[in-house]
Amino acid sequence: MLHRTTIATPVGDLRVVASDAGIREIRMPLPDRSIPMPAAENPDHPILKNAHDQLDEYFRGERRAFDLPLDVEGTDFQLAVWGALVDIPYGATESYGELAQRVGRPGAARAVGGANGRNPVPIVVPCHRVIGASGAMVGYSGPSEGGIAIKRWLIRHESGGTTA
């Protein structure tokens, strides 16, 4: 059974879905993410309560990494990229090309970008820390300008530029 809750954050309401094994999805507050969620509202589920607490700590500037159980599905390549994302230090950024190099696929920056864009648990798996080779903010939770604004906010937050 899937459970969900909505968590108010400085970047908008995050909708979080969990199975009994872990977090399956975090939806960003963007218009193109308004698809109904096949899960029962259950903010008291232990995994969702833990997610709420850890996300609150993150947005208050008190947490730099998450230790939530995850229950995500993806290809082997996607899972490798998502696993490498958590190794990007808090407050740091890395280019898609650098990330491709680290997952053993030099020259696969576009494929890394595709995997990054399919990350089902943004913030917890920090895909916002990946930027273009030129330093440009490109793509975040979809192509909309709203996603780029959230990415910019998260990077600024982690560099000490803003807190909740």
Label each PLM-derived region with a short phrase.
Residues A133-A164:
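…primarily DNA-binding HTH/wHTH and HhH modules…
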Residues A108-P122:
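Regulatory, non-catalytic segments
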Residues I123-V130:
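Short Lys/Arg-enriched helix C-cap and helix-to-coil transition segments
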